[in-house]
């Protein structure tokens, strides 16, 4: 039994397919007890003429997204929560807070997809890895993830080692980065997303991997589950493996959210 899938997208982001009702139907078929829609927040950090096509909803679509998911929650045969995935860009925290403030989300998920303007998880920008030092990339990525958690704007930190997506691994031992990230996350009071989407990409591994997840457990960080579904058929995909991983390191419960308040479900 999958207790929750807290990371579903919608067509509003421009790179997902299917109606939200189809995502719900798939969740019901799989026996998932609760889902959270977590679509991409508009790109608050870019001027209107510099927007990235098919990356996130437009700013004028955000109220409609909120209303759509709230209406869906009233009608669906399972628990549906309203979340949002917000990119962290250092120096843009006030703009981010201002965009989030008018809406009552059940949870706000923070993510890092850009390193100083480089969309490192975009296949179109993958060649940039060959032009940079991989250890420096990892250091910068985890520094940004730590800064994001410290803003206090996020309930959940998404796919915490997304930097490994294309299976480029650091030469240096990453454990010091992992330990420091766990300490910062714990002090910030965030929950970690165990995200199964990595199984669908070259890395072929859940985010976070076993070593990092073990460190998160040792630091007492709570976890939640997310498939990062951009198609109805990806709802719940890989979450049985994610649950197995979670249990293997010692977790016996996962987090759910309502009105940005955390609750726990036994697994």
Q: How should these model regions be labeled?
A:
Residues 37, 110, 159, 194, ...:
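Conserved beta-strand positions
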